[in-house]
């Protein structure tokens, strides 16, 4: 019997197709983003809307509460803005701040929308009860050492120890995966789905990337004209779902 919760049209859209895709280093992606950011393009909000839509589809299939692991950088900002969009459709959205520093605007948006901030200890105690985890701890920022540390590492170790883990959606790359070469520490949370923004990151198809990334969704942020100036780090055959972000409500109103 067909599952009444599943939309056949959406299911067809979300089915990955195998294609050869150019993958880029983190530096190349940042360079491609720079002109758009200089123009004032809201790339983070656009990425977060796409992330929230994909997370909402996951929750429709497997209903339950969502745990957002938010780091200090733009990756955490993406996750927190997505939490704001997701708060109206998920059963509950809990946010764990794994660093003292946080993207304040994104956190304020998430809390205003109904997400609640919980402690690492509370999240760890009830982690098996979540249906979905958004991994927004580390992204593609420049780091000399990408190993998870402190509360982030402890929480990931707790998740790894579960016999039945929640589904995991990685924000841009699984936290701790090197975005260029795909190397990773032993303590890393494998994703069921990775939502990557603007361009495929080389680390998703190199090293441990394929085993840790799950199904890859590639969100179009309009970087293609600028990526032509860069040489791909690698071109790989990969199962990928291409995503076009929905317009913000203000954008639609202006066009109308």
Curated annotation (Swiss-Prot):
Region annotation Disordered: where it falls in the sequence: 1-21
Signal peptide per UniProt: none
Binding site for K(+): 75, 135, 175
Biased composition annotated in UniProt, kind: Basic and acidic residues: 1-18
Domain YjeF N-terminal: 23-229
EC number: 5.1.99.6
Catalytic activity: (6R)-NADHX = (6S)-NADHX; (6R)-NADPHX = (6S)-NADPHX
Binding site for (6S)-NADPHX: 74-78, 139-147, 172
Cofactor binding mode and count: Binds 1 potassium ion per subunit.
InterPro entries: YjeF_N_dom, YjeF_N_dom_sf
Keywords: Isomerase, Metal-binding, NAD, NADP, Nucleotide-binding, Potassium
Family, as annotated: Belongs to the NnrE/AIBP family.
Role description: Catalyzes the epimerization of the S- and R-forms of NAD(P)HX, a damaged form of NAD(P)H that is a result of enzymatic or heat-dependent hydration. This is a prerequisite for the S-specific NAD(P)H-hydrate dehydratase to allow the repair of both epimers of NAD(P)HX.
Listed name of the protein: NAD(P)H-hydrate epimerase
Lineage, uppermost ranks: Bacteria, Bacillati, Actinomycetota, Actinomycetes, Micrococcales
Gene that this polypeptide is encoded by: nnrE
């Amino acid at each position: 019997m067909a599952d009444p919760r599943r939309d056949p049209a959406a299911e067809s859209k979300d089915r990955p197709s195998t294609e050869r895709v150019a993958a880029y280093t983190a530096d190349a992606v940042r360079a491609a983003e720079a002109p758009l950011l200089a123009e004032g393009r809201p790339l983070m909000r656009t990425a977060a809307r796409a992330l929230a839509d994909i997370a909402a589809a996951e929750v429709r299939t497997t209903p339950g509460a969502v745990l957002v692991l938010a780091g200090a950088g733009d990756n955490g900002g993406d996750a927190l803005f997505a939490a704001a969009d997701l708060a109206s459709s998920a059963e509950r959205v809990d946010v764990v701040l794994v660093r003292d520093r946080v993207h304040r605007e994104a956190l304020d948006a998430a809390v205003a929308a109904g997400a609640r901030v919980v402690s690492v200890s509370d999240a760890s105690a009830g982690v098996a009860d979540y249906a979905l985890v958004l991994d927004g701890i580390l992204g593609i920022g420049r780091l000399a050492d990408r190993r998870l540390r402190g509360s982030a590492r402890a929480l990931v170790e707790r998740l790894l120890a579960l016999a039945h883990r929640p589904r995991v959606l990685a924000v841009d790359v699984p936290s701790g995966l090197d975005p260029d070469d795909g190397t990773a520490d032993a303590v890393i949370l494998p994703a069921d789905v990775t939502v990557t923004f603007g361009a495929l990151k080389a680390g998703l198809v190199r090293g441990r990337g394929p085993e840790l990334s799950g199904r890859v969704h590639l969100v179009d942020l309009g970087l293609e004209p600028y990526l032509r100036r860069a040489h791909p780090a690698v071109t790989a055959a990969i199962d990928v779902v291409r995503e076009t972000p929905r317009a913000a409500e203000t954008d639609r109103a202006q066009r109308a």
